[in-house]
Amino acid sequence: MSVDQEKLKALNEALGKIEKDFGKGSVMKLGEATSMSIDVISTGAIGLDIAIGIGGLPRGRIVEVYGPESSGKTTVALSCVASAQKDGGIAAFIDAEHALDPVYAKALGVDVDNLIISQPDTGEQALEIAEALIRSGAIDIIVIDSVAALVPKAEIDGDMGDSHVGLQARLMSQALRKLTGSIKKSNCVAIFINQLREKVGIMFGNPETTTGGRALKFYSSVRLDVRKIDTIKQGDKVIGSRTRVKVVKNKVAPPFKQAEFDIMYGEGISKIGDLLDIAADVDIVKKSGSWYSYNDTKLGQGRENVKKFLEDNLDLTTEIDEKVRAFYNLNEEHEESGTSVSKEIVEE
């Protein structure tokens, strides 16, 4: 059905005026792929990149990472920071909890010398610093750790027993209204780490909820639920934890996929272990009993031994990595709602 020419002329005039007043790209047709392409930053865990569906965290969007204490939330966020820095990006970390361990961050691959860090006194200060950094257009990824620690100034200045109902939720709602547009324009990934609380008096359904009100749930394009599901031991010594990340909200691909990987204490996400699991799942690496093989090469017996073998043979590891990425089309363009979605694949 043809569009009325008078309407089309009026529309083009209106679009021209809007672009003149507000800048090119302020309004467009959804099918204009070049204007709507979404780049990504790898999470550093290939299984999680696959679960998100586009090969990593989408740039220009807000991401919420939440879960119980010591589940691996900050480790996942720092792994994303390390990936961005390896690709030449600039990263910032708003440490509202005043708990960032630079030694651990360095072990995860973070370039701590060039990491921009702030340890603000109040929630308002934290979010204003974040806004200023994002508006500069120079930041590729920013992490706010955590939402629960973004305490409003009125609460800090008040007495211990004072009631401040809804103050933090209003602060988050106001801040996110301002930040969303700036994050999109700067093509930055904004990761908000959040904690869990339990609703009082819930008899049925899930009593868990995140702090800071509902605004972050709405504004987030991706929400990741991080849980520790098992402990990794070497004899009697605990050396890490098995972690499951579920994509509970996803605006750029189908949601509810999940990834499992090892977080080794003092090392972070076991990237080679994650790659081995994914490769075995899709038969790129063959598994027979406890033996692993790739093409005509026997990799070894037992998962830990094979991980060590792959660590010592990085050329072979790179070859397997490329085959896994090709299998899941992580090196190709994807279409999302009629929009071309391109990705930056970060070399592990």
Swiss-Prot record:
Signal peptide coordinates: none
GO BP terms, alphabetized: DNA recombination; DNA repair; SOS response
Superkingdom: Bacteria
Coiled coil residues, start to end: none
InterPro entries the record matches: AAA+_ATPase, DNA_recomb/repair_RecA, DNA_recomb/repair_RecA_CS, P-loop_NTPase, RecA-like_C, RecA-like_N, RecA_ATP-bd, RecA_C_sf
Tagged with keyword DNA repair: yes
Gene Ontology CC annotations of this record: cytosol
One example GO MF annotation: single-stranded DNA binding
Protein localization: Cytoplasm
Annotated Pfam families: RecA (PF00154), RecA_C (PF21096)
Keywords assigned by UniProt, alphabetized: ATP-binding, Cytoplasm, DNA damage, DNA recombination, DNA repair, DNA-binding, Nucleotide-binding, SOS response
Cross-referenced SMART domains: AAA
Protein family per UniProt: Belongs to the RecA family.
Function: Can catalyze the hydrolysis of ATP in the presence of single-stranded DNA, the ATP-dependent uptake of single-stranded DNA by duplex DNA, and the ATP-dependent hybridization of homologous single-stranded DNAs. It interacts with LexA causing its activation and leading to its autocatalytic cleavage.
Entries under NCBIfam families matching the protein: tigrfam_recA
Name of this chain's protein: Protein RecA
Organism of origin: Clostridioides difficile (strain 630) (Peptoclostridium difficile)
